Design a protein with these regions (language model features):
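Conserved N-terminal segment of class I S-adenosyl-L-methionine
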Residues: 1-109, 113-117, 126-133, 191-195, ...
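Short, hinge-like loop/turn segments at secondary-structure boundaries
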Residues: 91-93, 163-166, 206-209
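A short His-aromatic
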Residues: 121-123
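Short glycine-dipeptide loop
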Residues: 139-145
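A C-terminal cap/extension of S-adenosyl-L-methionine-dependent methyltransferases
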Residues: 146, 190-242
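Short, glycine-/aromatic-enriched active-site segment of Class I SAM-dependent methyltransferases
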Residues: 147-169
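Short alpha-helix
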Residues: 168-183
Length: 242
């Protein structure tokens, strides 16, 4: 690991304006609408499917997957501080480990779903290629890789791309599809991180998002002559099928 990464990751939890982990498990509810939507829409229907969340942080995805009834889900994170936070929150199945080494330890076609939330942007291009190949190797035929990552197509792309000193790159729906299809995945679909209405405040945000998004589409059409349905959110969700 490079020296700059080693220094930053040692203080990844405490060297921030806001904490990465909530004070208690009940405080994870703010992420529930989005993560539950991802789980309902993209996780396997089989609750015994083998699921691995690589770069799981304090285990939010693991927690909501377990709450949804998934029995064989685990998370791995290289940050001891993050794993300690998961343990403090009482989230089972989160362990410390190197992500690439974890993949290398797995048998071919032994996993149904790989999840990486806010992970692949930390790799250089040369580092990412073997990581992608390993994910493809361990996934079963028809298995999925769910990727959440900064969206380089967003008008505010710089906020996410440069908001973390360890970020090496950002992706667009076309560049991430280019990478994954060239690496053996059969289908890649990208989704916008739009607000999810679940109360008054979030509904207002959703309405405003629709209005401003429409304006951005018009702006895009003025330049290109196309009403292409771009992804404008600061992050995107990509789902790749092997």
């Amino acid at each position: 690991m490079s020296k700059y990464r080693e220094r930053i990751y040692q203080h990844y939890v405490n060297a921030r304006d806001s904490p990465l982990a909530p004070a208690s498990i009940s405080r994870l509810t703010s992420r529930a609408p989005y993560l539950n939507k991802v789980i309902r829409g993209h996780f396997p229907s089989d609750r015994s499917a083998r699921i691995i969340d690589l770069g799981c942080g304090h285990g939010a995805v693991v927690h909501f997957a377990q709450t949804a009834g998934y029995q064989n889900v685990m998370g791995v994170d290289r940050s001891p501080a993050q794993v300690k936070e998961a343990q403090r929150l009482g989230i089972a199945g989160v362990t410390e480990g190197d992500l690439s080494e974890t993949l290398e330890s797995l048998s071919d076609e032994s996993v149904d779903l790989i999840v990486t939330f806010d992970v692949i942007e930390h790799f250089t291009k040369d580092e990412l290629m073997p990581f992608v190949d390993e994910v493809n190797r361990v996934l079963r035929k028809g298995g999925k890789w769910i990727i959440h990552t900064p969206n380089g197509e967003s008008p505010f792309a710089g906020r996410m791309r440069f908001g973390d000193f360890t970020h090496e790159q950002a992706f667009t729906r076309t560049s991430i599809a280019q990478l994954l299809i060239a690496s053996g995945f059969s289908l890649v679909t990208c989704y916008e991180d739009a607000p999810i209405p679940h109360g008054v405040k979030s509904t207002v945000r959703w309405i405003l998002w629709k209005i401003f998004r429409g304006g951005l589409r018009v702006f895009f059409a003025a330049e290109t002559g196309s009403l292409d349905d771009c992804i404008f959110s600061q992050n995107l969700l990509a789902v790749a099928v092997k």
